[in-house]
Amino acid sequence: MKLNRMLSVFALVAALTAASVSFAANGPHTSSKFEGPKANTGTVTHTVENGKSILRVSADFKVPDTPAPTWRVVDSKGNIYTLDAFKVKAGNNEKREVVVPSYVHGIVKVQVYCAWAEVLLGEAGFSSPIT
């Protein structure tokens, strides 16, 4: 009887711990500061909104003045995923957030990449992989 009670308490503690870890994993995560030759201001924050994984640069981030600055992410296995361009062709609008595709998991870095010159402009890392 005592063993069953201890197992029940242990199962409850394990479930609560798993729930709190899951909740913390879905909370906002902010990267280190961008570092690189052209992208060296601001940070990027990861959030989950309406079931979508979103990356958003901070207000102090300056989009590099290059022909084709582009969002890229690197996962924990070293795979690189090229996402959207920072600049919208119509006018001087900037795309300061991007939805991460559902097949991308374990993001450890966000990069600003010039797709035209094929050169890395800067990157920011997370303290642990973002799922």
Where does each model-flagged region fall?
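Bacterial N-terminal signal peptides that target proteins for export
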Residues: 1-10
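Cleavable N-terminal signal peptides
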Residues: 11-12, 22
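Transition segment at domain starts
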Residues: 23-50, 129-131
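Short amphipathic, basic-aromatic surface patches that mediate peripheral association
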Residues: 57-61
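Beta-strand signatures of extracellular beta-sandwich domains
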Residues: 70-74
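An anionic, turn-rich surface loop/hairpin at beta-sheet edges
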Residues: 77-105
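Short, exposed beta-strand-loop hairpins at the edges of beta-sheets
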Residues: 99-126
